[in-house]
């Protein structure tokens, strides 16, 4: 006599393709807050998240749309924007009293030089302690936007100097 179904229904977020529970468990077991980097078609989002029983809590967040307030003139979804957003996030986190984190890129592919690693480089350059390997980081020229100025000089304008000026403006906010 059979009892119950013979199939297994996965967790809803796994079924929707939103969560890798094996990777999530390994990140949570460290006990360190997570630096969550997510990229959309229009912006980069970086958050400091801690797990709780009721659900994860976001302690600090930075969005690439905030860069316009610092004088940034480029695209908010580019590699330089990811670098500056990571730097802005680190300044906010350090000012709030959080000095370390571990990187959580979610379901994004870990390709060397990707925008999620540009955000990591920005956070590390601003002083946040995040473990990483040197081989995954983008080149300095890509972080400053030189590759954009090379293939689209009329659209980029003076992007390299703009990125450097915005980086200095963000670092001035560090208390």
From Swiss-Prot:
UniProt keyword list: Ribonucleoprotein, Ribosomal protein, RNA-binding, rRNA-binding
InterPro entries: Rbsml_uL18_euk
GO CC, alphabetical: cytosolic large ribosomal subunit
UniProt xrefs under Pfam families: Ribosomal_L5e
A GO molecular-function descriptor: structural constituent of ribosome
Regions annotated as coiled coil: none
CDD domains linked: Ribosomal_L18_L5e
Oligomer status and interactors: Part of the 50S ribosomal subunit. Contacts the 5S and 23S rRNAs.
Function: This is one of the proteins that bind and probably mediate the attachment of the 5S RNA into the large ribosomal subunit, where it forms part of the central protuberance.
Alphabetized NCBIfam families for the sequence: PRK08569.1 (NF006342)
Family, similarity comment: Belongs to the universal ribosomal protein uL18 family.
Record-given protein name: Large ribosomal subunit protein uL18
Species lineage: Archaea, Methanobacteriati, Methanobacteriota, Stenosarchaea group, Methanomicrobia
